[in-house]
Amino acid sequence: MSHIVKIYDTCIGCTQCVRACPLDVLEMVPWDGCKAEQMASAPRTEDCVGCKRCESACPTDFLSVRVYTSSESTRSMGLAY
């Protein structure tokens, strides 16, 4: 099953999600809009198994990183009936 990893602009650049991922799906990239001047990125989503350890590790009130199955992502965008 394919998964979609979304990183939101609430990311504080703490690297907790990157360190929690057992498959190195996430990495930190430079980002001017973030306090820490870096933000999580998910360049290898094809390796994501949906364990959601990144979500559990995120310390922000609104999770900055979310993992969806393809069908969940489609539903959340209002594209499925």
UniProtKB/Swiss-Prot annotation:
Q: Signal sequence span per UniProt?
A: none
Q: Which reaction does it catalyse?
A: reduced [plastocyanin] + hnu + oxidized [2Fe-2S]-[ferredoxin] = oxidized [plastocyanin] + reduced [2Fe-2S]-[ferredoxin]
- What's the protein's topology in the membrane? Peripheral membrane protein
GO annotation, cellular component aspect: chloroplast thylakoid membrane; photosystem I
Keywords assigned: 4Fe-4S, Chloroplast, Electron transport, Iron, Iron-sulfur, Membrane, Metal-binding, Oxidoreductase, Photosynthesis, Photosystem I, Plastid, Repeat, Thylakoid, Transport
Can you tell me which residues bind [4Fe-4S] cluster 1? C11, C14, C17, C58
**Required co-factors:** [4Fe-4S] cluster
Boundaries of each 4Fe-4S ferredoxin-type domain copy?
Answer: 2-31, 39-68
Highest taxon of source: Eukaryota
Localization, UniProt = Plastid, Chloroplast thylakoid membrane
- Name the EC number(s): 1.97.1.12
Q: Which PROSITE patterns match?
A: 4FE4S_FER_1, 4FE4S_FER_2
What's this protein's function?
Apoprotein for the two 4Fe-4S centers FA and FB of photosystem I (PSI); essential for photochemical activity. FB is the terminal electron acceptor of PSI, donating electrons to ferredoxin. The C-terminus interacts with PsaA/B/D and helps assemble the protein into the PSI complex. Required for binding of PsaD and PsaE to PSI. PSI is a plastocyanin/cytochrome c6-ferredoxin oxidoreductase, converting photonic excitation into a charge separation, which transfers an electron from the donor P700 chlorophyll pair to the spectroscopically characterized acceptors A0, A1, FX, FA and FB in turn.
Q: What is this protein called?
A: Photosystem I iron-sulfur center
- In its UniProt entry, the species of origin is given as Stigeoclonium helveticum
Gene name? psaC
